């Protein structure tokens, strides 16, 4: 990892794992690691496995709140706790790794600024992704003070195929034997906490072995399995390139990555949902009629007539805004575009035990190519019903098992009330 800061960081004897309920409650432990000099003050990379990006911003929070950590912690919630840390200068690289049912931000690389809005003194961003636009968080660069650069990578992690689980266990068994045989060989690397067994050569050997086995085996299943492992290796290489820009990294896992609920789906009765749909149909009919009239005549009289209807008052501001930008607005096109821009609902996918196992194997395959993190944070997210309460304990144990298999001894801190999520 880059920077001279790395050379002066303290090392934990065992990898600390902080397990909390609400996701933003991991932040005090990250700040504690910064204060104890286990993490640098700046240029930290943050690897975030979650069904939700958590990259919103407290809309009305003054930007300078980030410089008073106790005030900051009291202002944050589960959806908006990462970006203030970026503005504070601690996180410079964020990788959101998401399952296939979570599509809130476009996949790929996003480079933008996070800074203080000169007019409101709140935190805002220069990203034009719908995720930020829909919450009114975008401002142009010239409107920002003290901007911080953020490199955001959004990466999809596919579950392994069912047939692969047993096959991968065999590969890992071989890899362990290779590690034992090479236990006398150690390497000092920029990612290590001192001498450690050679991991990179083992991973490469395993991968090469998989490729050779595939070439000599006509089984399509085996080829697919090897391709999946190779895919995880490629994703890991991409993440390693990102980590090389930072001075240290935190691995963060929300257990709803493996199984997630949209708690709002259960808040309404069938009758309430029917009423909501009927009201929405009437609203769409009114909008269609209003825009049809505007196509014929967009005079102030027409606009005011429609704006007098319930729920249509914002039409005046919309039409005035359109007229200021174009001589003859195409109201039909604007109406059609409006019908397609509803923001995606919260992800909802209650996984089977098999699906959870397959995702756990994918996470294992991904992490085994990465260097050891400085610390791990885990959010249960069960009290707010994002991770199913009947699954959360099982998922937590399985995740800890994966971490132990990869990193050895763990220093686990359970910072939540025992039994708080029991079904």
From Swiss-Prot:
Highest rank taxon of the organism: Eukaryota
Pfam families: UPF0489
InterPro entries named among the record's database cross-references: UPF0489
Similarity comment: Belongs to the UPF0489 family.
Protein name: UPF0489 protein C5orf22 homolog
């Amino acid at each position: 990892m880059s920077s001279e800061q790395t050379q002066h960081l303290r090392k934990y004897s065992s990898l600390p794992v902080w397990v909390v309920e609400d996701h933003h409650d991991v932040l005090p432990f990250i700040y504690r690691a910064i204060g104890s000099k286990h993490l640098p003050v700046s240029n930290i990379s943050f690897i975030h496995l979650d069904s939700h990006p958590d990259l919103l911003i407290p809309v009305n929070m003054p930007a300078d709140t980030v410089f008073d950590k106790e005030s900051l912690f009291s202002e944050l919630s589960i959806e908006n706790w990462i970006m203030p840390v970026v503005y504070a200068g601690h996180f410079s690289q964020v990788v959101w790794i998401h399952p296939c049912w979570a599509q809130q931000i476009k996949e790929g690389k996003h480079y933008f600024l996070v800074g203080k809005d000169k007019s409101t003194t709140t935190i805002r961003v220069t990203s034009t992704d719908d995720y930020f636009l829909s919450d009114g968080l975008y401002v142009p660069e010239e409107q920002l003070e003290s901007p911080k650069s953020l490199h955001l990578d959004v990466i999809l992690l596919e579950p392994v195929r069912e047939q692969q689980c047993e096959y991968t266990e065999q590969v890992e068994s071989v890899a362990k034997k290779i590690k034992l045989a090479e236990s006398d060989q150690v390497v000092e690397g920029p990612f290590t906490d001192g001498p450690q067994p050679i991991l990179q050569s083992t991973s490469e050997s395993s991968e090469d072995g998989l490729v050779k086995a595939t070439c000599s085996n006509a089984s399509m299943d085996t080829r697919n399995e090897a391709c999946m492992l190779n895919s995880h290796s490629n994703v890991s290489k991409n993440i390693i390139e990102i980590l090389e820009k930072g001075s240290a990294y935190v691995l963060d896992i929300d257990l709803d990555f493996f199984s997630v609920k949209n708690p709002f789906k259960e808040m309404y009765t069938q009758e309430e949902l029917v009423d909501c749909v009927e009201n929405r149909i009437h609203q769409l009919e009114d909008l269609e009629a209003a825009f049809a009239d505007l196509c014929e005549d967009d005079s102030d009289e027409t606009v005011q007539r429609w704006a007098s209807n319930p729920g249509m008052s914002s039409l005046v501001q919309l039409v005035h805004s359109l007229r200021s930008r174009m001589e003859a607005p195409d109201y039909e096109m604007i109406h059609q575009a409006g019908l397609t821009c509803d923001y995606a609902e919260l992800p909802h996918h209650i996984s089977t035990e098999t699906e959870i196992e397959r995702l756990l194997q994918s996470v294992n395959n991904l992490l085994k190519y990465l260097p050891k993190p400085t610390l791990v944070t885990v959010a249960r997210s069960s009290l707010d019903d994002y991770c199913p309460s009947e699954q959360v304990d099982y998922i937590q144990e399985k995740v800890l098992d994966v971490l132990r298999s990869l990193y050895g001894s763990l220093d686990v801190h359970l910072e939540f009330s025992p039994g708080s999520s029991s079904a």
